[in-house]
Amino acid sequence: MTWTTHDYENIPGTYVFDGKHSYGAYPLNKLLFSFNTEECRTEFDADPAAYCDKFGVEGKYKEFVLKKDFLGMLRAGANIYFMAKMAIPRGTSVQDAGAQFQGITTKEFQAKLLAKGDGLVERLAKRGGYWNG
C-alpha cells in the first residue's frame, strides 16, 4: 500500500490517527472496540494475553495492552476513543491517561487543566460568550 506524506505528520508531540498510522493497529483497535460489551471486558480481565491472541494482537501492540501503556498504544495507531473503553472500566481515568501521554503525574495534569481554566469567563466574553476551541 502507498501512503502520501502530509505536513501534519511532523508536528512535535502529535500522534496522527490516519490510515497510515492505524493500518497496522487494526487488530488492536478491533480488540479495544470490543470493550463496548460487559461480556468482552470480563473475558479480557480473566486472561488479557489470551484475549489479545483471540483478536490477533501481537508484538508491540500486545505488550502495550498488557502493560496498559496508553501512550504506546496511541503512538502505534490506537483510536483514542476506543482506548477509553479499555481504560475507564479498569479504574484509569481520562486524566490518568492524559498525564501518561504527557509524561507527568495525574496531579500535575489536573493542575494544568485547572490553570487553563483561569480567566475562562473573560475569554468567553471576548468571543461573544461561546467557545469553539
Short names for language-model regions:
Residues 1-133:
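Charged, low-complexity intrinsically disordered segments
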